[in-house]
Amino acid sequence: MGKTTTTLNLGIGLAHQGRKVLLVDADPQGDLTTALGWTDADDLPVTLATQMKKILQDEPFVYNEGILHHEEGVDIIPTNIELSGMEISLVNAMSREQTLKLYLADLKKDYDYILIDCMPSLGMLTINALTAADSVIVPVEAHYLPG
């Protein structure tokens, strides 16, 4: 439906205008990660799931660890299928909707824009993204209305 494409193109467009942009792939399918060329995301040592898991388990973490830089000028927090297990972990967590916001809090000072690509359903990961967001873009498909 264009969510990943919108996130990618908007991020690269902003980067080309001299803005510092961080893309967050919050969809376990990892299409944003793949679109930027990381096709072996399962082999990455640190992903969004890794960092969120550390927050949930109250473990120390380096906030900018695992951020990858792309030649188009954007940075990305990649994801892989491991993120799908995060939905289950978040269900029983305290302040579960704040996990992503807590992670991104320290990163905000390093970027002009943080764009979060979400999955097409309203699960705990999407709720986390909405809680962390200052603004929301909802791509819709235009249809002709008869009459």
Please provide the spans of the model-predicted regions:
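P-loop NTP-binding core
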Residues: M1-G147
